[in-house]
């Protein structure tokens, strides 16, 4: 039931986005007729809308664009479609498959005069009279309806020329009759100015924030378009919206789109531009902006970077800043009732804004525009790639799933990086000196999935730019042994990211943290690196000592900041290496700057508990001194899984040696099994050192051989004609034997005993290894309780022994 009510409320919150289906809403289709003034409908649709052949109709497209056309019937057109050619589609700013509305427009006047200008790049090199060759035949006897701002294409004299309607009398639309005067004097219009208006942002250029967009539409469009609704119900329409969220999520873009789509007057105030050195001028700048907007109502005032002009008054030292905040407050209250002025503001630091601004009646709605989820990312990628040439193998869904924590700006950068990579591949065919590039090269360009993969490897989300996250190139194969630990880790990090539905089904939140402990050199850090690489989560590595600074309160702020970043870029793995340096048992350390270390631990503890459950943030700690770590951090709910990573046994040692020598040429007679048998008590790092030394010896021998041969060649050039084989093709037994002479154990038996003891105490404190439910129905227990007993319990116990022994 809950899910049903959820979806219902979800429907209500985005109700404004739904397209209402009315008979005059039609889907745009490609036209067969090349005429610029004609659209065609099916006969049935024309009867339904009571239109006759040759009627003038008004079409409404995107971004408040309209066009006037003549309607004809076309029997091949299906009922819900409307056919129009490219020129009309451009004027309406629509694509094939978009929805437009059509309405009869019976009383279009005949024009007295119209003014049209050609667009410069289509008339280059044309001599002669434009009017005679192009315009006269186009308009002659045609009675074409035109609208101010339209662009139309005229073919004639071997080429096509585009004209723009600059002015019509009567405005805004009229029919060009035989006695209409057509002016075409003046400078041709530059294509760039035209393109700019074409590239205006609309609602369809915004992806990944559907709910927020619905909120903003009902806050902005309803009061501007239908103020009567609010009058009827008897409330004041809202007047301020504060958009906040991390940089790059599209706050300014949304404001632009709203302005374009509502057609309201748009007044942009950049925070810092208002400031002036003269007393009182900054405030009057603000007042002017608001007056200007009120004159041009309905209007939207958009204040970008609000935190620059309205910081908290008690924190600011300058008198001017305080006065500006006060001025803004009085202006927002003093907006006359229903003056149809809406104030929107954007900031990425909502908490540094003066609280008086955030009350109802000023900025009444705060819309959090957060980091998009994978469906949102897919929308954004589709928007950015709709004009790109993609090859067939590009799977945008996969790209969307792999870009955790990316905001819209990062995805745009990702697309352009992939496109650049596609161009780089063709660089050998492109010469920078040439004037033009071959059409063949141009047509063969397409962005492939490999380009996207390359771009993915280059890009990291902007939320994590400061704590630069190098995802390490370590895979599970690089880690020898430790199979159980690997499985445990995969379950911890990958399951919540990949199978969240299972956790919902069983009604549990996934566990948040793991602590690896064990002797140095056993691969604790390596494991954390591998998990960061294998599951597609972001990875932040925190070196303990970096958090502490000399300033009071700064160390704790660092901790808070890191956790905030991780939450923004969820799913994210936070890796604390050398946890013992920042999470020592509290109260014991005398003489450290005012107990800074204690405060850092307190901060970490509260952060781990206060982690909002929605975000997938995992904490992995690694330490080789588990005995001095504060016990509060080891309780379930914080770092609940304590995993002992022991010295490798013989099987693991073979695996480690093999993993180390995966890429090296090793002679057939080197017996790694024997080597593993002999190196009892060696840690993984020690084994790696043996392999490295053997490699080094082989390299040394190889270089000495080359030098010797070079000398011989110089003394006796004729004898050395025959090219010899490589004298040292692989790492031989004697290299390993030599290396073993220097091998040493880094962990003494004494240390091992300490770890075993610690693991043992943990084991004993559990003490429920042989726990069983009673078999019968004792104490009123039903049969359902007994069902869980038996093999399950003993199996559980073996697992535990395996991992922690």
UniProtKB/Swiss-Prot annotation:
Q: Detail which positions bind ATP 1.
A: 247-253, 348, 384
Look up keyword rRNA-binding and say if it applies: no
Q: Where in the cell is it found?
A: Cytoplasm, Cytosol; Endoplasmic reticulum; Nucleus; Cytoplasm, Stress granule
Compositionally biased spans, kind Gly residues = 776-793
The UniProt PTM text for this protein says: Phosphorylated.
Q: Which enzyme class, named as a word?
A: hydrolase
Q: Which reaction does it catalyse?
A: ATP + H2O = ADP + phosphate + H(+)
Annotated positions binding ATP 2: 521-526
Q: How is its activity regulated?
A: ATPase activity is inhibited or reduced by lowering pH from 9.0 to 7.0, and by addition of Ca(2+), EDTA, KNO(3) or by treatment with N-ethylmaleimide (NEM).
**What SMART domains does the entry give?**
AAA (SM00382), CDC48_2 (SM01072), CDC48_N (SM01073)
Top-level taxonomic group: Eukaryota
What's the main place this protein lives? cytoplasm
Q: What GO MF annotations does this protein's record show? A: ATP binding; ATP hydrolysis activity; identical protein binding; lipid binding; protein-containing complex binding
GO BP: autophagosome maturation; autophagy; cardiac muscle cell development; cellular response to arsenite ion; cellular response to heat; chordate embryonic development; DNA damage response; DNA repair
**Role, per record:** Necessary for the fragmentation of Golgi stacks during mitosis and for their reassembly after mitosis. Involved in the formation of the nuclear envelope, and of the transitional endoplasmic reticulum (tER). The transfer of membranes from the endoplasmic reticulum to the Golgi apparatus occurs via 50-70 nm transition vesicles which derive from part-rough, part-smooth transitional elements of the endoplasmic reticulum (tER). Vesicle budding from the tER is an ATP-dependent process.
- PANTHER family given in the database record: AAA-FAMILY ATPASE (PTHR23077), TRANSITIONAL ENDOPLASMIC RETICULUM ATPASE (PTHR23077:SF69)
Family, similarity comment:
Belongs to the AAA ATPase family.
Q: How does it assemble?
A: Homohexamer. Forms a ring-shaped particle of 12.5 nm diameter, that displays 6-fold radial symmetry. Interacts with the FACT/DUF complex, which includes subunits ssrp1/duf87 and supt16h/duf140.
Can you say what this protein is called?
Transitional endoplasmic reticulum ATPase
């Amino acid at each position: 039931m809950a899910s049903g009510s959820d979806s219902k409320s979800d429907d209500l919150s985005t109700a404004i986005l739904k397209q209402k289906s009315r008979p005059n809403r039609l889907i745009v289709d490609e036209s067969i007729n090349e005429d610029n003034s004609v659209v065609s409908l099916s006969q049935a649709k024309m009867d339904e809308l009571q239109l006759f052949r040759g009627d003038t109709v008004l079409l409404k497209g995107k971004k408040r664009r309209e066009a006037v056309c003549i309607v004809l019937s076309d029997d091949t057109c299906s009922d819900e479609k409307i056919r129009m050619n490219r020129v009309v589609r451009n004027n309406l700013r629509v694509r094939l498959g978009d929805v437009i509305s059509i309405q009869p427009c019976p009383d279009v006047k005949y024009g007295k005069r119209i003014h049209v200008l050609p667009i410069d790049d289509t008339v280059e090199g044309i001599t002669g009279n434009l009017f005679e060759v192009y315009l006269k035949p186009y308009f002659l006897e045609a009675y074409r309806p035109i609208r101010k701002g339209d662009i139309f294409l005229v073919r004639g004299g071997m080429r096509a020329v585009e004209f723009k309607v600059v002015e019509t009398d009567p405005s805004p639309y009229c029919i060009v009759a035989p006695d209409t005067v057509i002016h075409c004097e003046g400078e041709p219009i530059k294509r760039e100015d035209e393109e700019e208006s074409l590239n205006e942002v609309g609602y369809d250029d915004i992806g990944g924030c559907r709910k927020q967009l619905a909120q903003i539409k009902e806050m902005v469009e309803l009061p501007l378009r239908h103020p009567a609704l609010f009058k009827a119900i008897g409330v004041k329409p809202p007047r301020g919206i504060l958009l906040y969220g991390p940089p790059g999520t599209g706050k300014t873009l949304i404001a632009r789109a709203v302005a374009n789509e509502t057609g309201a007057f748009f007044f942009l105030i950049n925070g810092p531009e208002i400031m002036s050195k003269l007393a009182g001028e900054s405030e009057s700048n603000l007042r002017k902006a608001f007056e200007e907007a009120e004159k041009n109502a309905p209007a939207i005032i958009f204040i970008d970077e609000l935190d620059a002009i309205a910081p908290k008054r008690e924190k600011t030292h300058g008198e001017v800043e305080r006065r500006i905040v006060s001025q803004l407050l009085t202006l927002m209250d003093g907006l006359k009732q229903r003056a149809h002025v809406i104030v929107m503001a954007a900031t990425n630091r909502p908490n540094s804004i003066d609280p008086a601004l955030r009350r109802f009646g000023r900025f009444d709605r705060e819309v959090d525009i957060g980091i998009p989820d994978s469906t949102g990312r897919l929308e954004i990628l589709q928007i950015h790639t709709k004009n790109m040439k993609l090859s067939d193998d590009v799977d945008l869904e996969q790209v969307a799933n792999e870009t955790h924590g990316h905001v819209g700006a990062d995805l745009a950068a990702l697309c352009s990086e992939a496109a650049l990579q596609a161009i780089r591949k063709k660089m050998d065919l492109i010469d920078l000196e040439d004037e033009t590039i071959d059409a063949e090269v141009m047509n063969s360009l397409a962005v492939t999935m490999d380009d996207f993969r390359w771009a993915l490897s280059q890009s990291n989300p902007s939320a994590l730019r400061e704590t630069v996250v190098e995802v390490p190139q370590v895979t599970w194969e690089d880690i020898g042994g430790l199979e159980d630990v690997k499985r445990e880790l995969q379950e911890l990090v990958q399951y919540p990211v990949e199978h969240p539905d299972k956790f919902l089904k069983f009604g549990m939140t996934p566990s948040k943290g793991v602590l690896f402990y064990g002797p140095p050199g056993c691969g604790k850090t390596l494991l954390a690196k591998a998990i960061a690489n294998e599951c597609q989560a972001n990875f932040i590595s925190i070196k303990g000592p970096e958090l502490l600074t000399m300033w009071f309160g700064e160390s704790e702020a660092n901790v808070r900041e890191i956790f905030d970043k991780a939450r923004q870029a969820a799913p994210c793995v936070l890796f604390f290496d050398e946890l013992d340096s920042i999470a020592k048992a509290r109260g014991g350390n005398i003489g450290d700057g005012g107990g800074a270390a204690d405060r850092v631990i307190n901060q970490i503890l509260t952060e781990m508990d206060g982690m909002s459950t929605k975000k997938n943030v995992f904490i992995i700690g690694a330490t080789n001194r588990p005995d001095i770590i504060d016990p509060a951090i080891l309780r379930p709910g914080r770092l609940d899984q304590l995993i002992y990573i022991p010295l490798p046994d013989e099987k693991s040692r073979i695996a480690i040696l093999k993993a180390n020598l995966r890429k090296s040429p090793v002679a057939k007679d080197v017996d790694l099994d024997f080597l593993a048998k002999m190196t009892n008590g060696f840690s993984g790092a020690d084994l790696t050192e043996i392999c490295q030394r053997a490699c080094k010896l082989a390299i040394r021998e190889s270089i000495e051989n080359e030098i010797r041969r070079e000398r011989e060649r110089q003394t006796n050039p004729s004898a050395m004609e025959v090219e010899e084989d490589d004298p040292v093709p692989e790492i031989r037994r004697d290299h390993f034997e030599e290396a073993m002479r220097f091998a040493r154990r880094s962990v003494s038996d004494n240390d091992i005993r300490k770890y075993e003891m610690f693991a043992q105490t943990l084991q004993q404190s559990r003490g429920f290894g042989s726990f069983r439910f009673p078999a019968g129905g004792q104490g009123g227990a039903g049969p359902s309780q007994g069902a869980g007993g038996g093999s399950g319990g003993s199996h559980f116990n073996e697992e535990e022994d395996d991992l922690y022994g």
